[in-house]
Design a protein with these regions (language model features):
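Active-site region of the double-stranded beta-helix
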Residues: 1-117, 127-182
Length: 182
């Protein structure tokens, strides 16, 4: 379902799939062979293949990301994209150890929202709120589908069915003052 999120506190938001250039950069920096072989896939196909990875392959991929992230955090000269991804991997791995959702989070666009910023997510778009407090505005519905990073019910196959073909990053919307105090 479509939704708009408005940050109350600083927030980390994951939404859609990173552009292929960023995916390739991350695959190389993290030594993520599981991703290198999938960079050219459509966003929907990439997410589908990651969600359907056998658990033993996912466990190896997660361990590789966590190990690489810890090394990259101490290196100088890494790009902001790689540094932010390393921070994300560490944060998610600590909150949800061993969760396959980490692999999905790794390929998603990371947005940092300041208080008052908002981002619109269309229906069929994978998204997650990693940290922070927000107000969510959405259509009434009971069809929340989860693929990981939660203790709640997960229905990854149903999520795959409703994923949109395009998984672009939303446009960040910043508040503008309309006058004194408004």
């Amino acid at each position: 379902k479509p939704e708009n999120v408005i940050a109350i506190t600083p927030m980390k938001v994951l939404t859609g799939v990173r552009p292929q250039g960023e995916l390739q950069e991350l695959a190389e920096a993290f030594g993520a062979d599981w991703l290198s072989s999938r960079v050219q896939l459509s966003p929907k196909q990439l997410l589908t293949e990651i969600i359907r990875l056998p658990q033993d392959a996912a466990d190896r991929a997660i361990a590789g990301l966590v190990n690489a992230a810890q090394k990259l955090m101490t290196q100088d000269g890494v790009s902001a994209t790689v540094s932010d991804a390393a921070d994300l991997v560490n944060l998610v791995a600590q909150k949800y150890p061993g969760d396959k959702g980490l692999l999905v989070a790794f390929v998603m666009n990371l947005m940092n929202l300041a208080p008052g910023d908002s981002a619109f997510t269309p229906d069929g778009q994978v998204h997650a709120y990693v940290s922070g407090t927000a107000i969510e505005l959405m259509n009434p519905s009971d069809n929340v589908l989860r693929a990981g990073l939660t203790p709640k019910h997960i229905d990854a196959e149903e999520l795959i069915k409703v994923l949109g073909e395009h998984q672009d990053a939303p446009v960040l919307q910043r508040p503008a003052a309309n006058g004194l105090g408004v």
